[in-house]
Amino acid sequence: MSYDEDRANLTYQGAMDVMSLKDINPEVFTHAKHIHISSIFMQSGLKKDLIEILKLAQANGVTTSLDTQWDPVEEWDLDYANVLPLITVFMPNETELKALTHKDTIDEAIECIAPYINNAIIKQGSRGSLLIKKDGTRHQMAAMLNENVVDCIGAGDSFNSGFIAQFVQGATLEDCQRYGNMTGAVNTTAAGGTTAFTCLEDVERVAKERFGFVK
């Protein structure tokens, strides 16, 4: 549910409350190329096993990404010092990162995670995104702004999908960032989180027509 810049989520937990590592087919870790984990605070079983899951992925050469998303109870009890070294790309937004690290500014929050990350991409809404590499290199990229936003529901997830789609194809992190900015922008051209995405050709056509994007 979304109004202006406020939103509320209503979720039926279902299996998310009980699903854990024991429910995952071990073959996933030998067949997968990349594993993306999202909304970890809403998945208590997987959260408990998160480090073990990530170690299994790492042992099998599987790259990983994590978008914590919002903690509905706002406890933010994730052991990021031990989790982040096992994550290939950490993908929070600024608000979530400040909440996770219990810091008031984004610079302070980045300082907290810097010793532990491999790579991080921080989503900044209408300001774009900030890429931080393991060596400390930063790359700020402006957003592709939509002057006629329908809504922003799912824009962060859409950014993730674009970034990861390029990442698994071996693109540079900067190219992944650019593609993520594009898919996040395209998301805002239609209502809901997935309506704007029918097929790759249409997404790139809309991106070119609306934002001048050329791959």
Summary of predicted features, one role per range:
Residues Y3-H139, D202, E209-K215:
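Ribokinase/PfkB-type carbohydrate-kinase core domain
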Residues L56, I106-K215:
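Conserved phosphate-binding/catalytic region of the ribokinase-like
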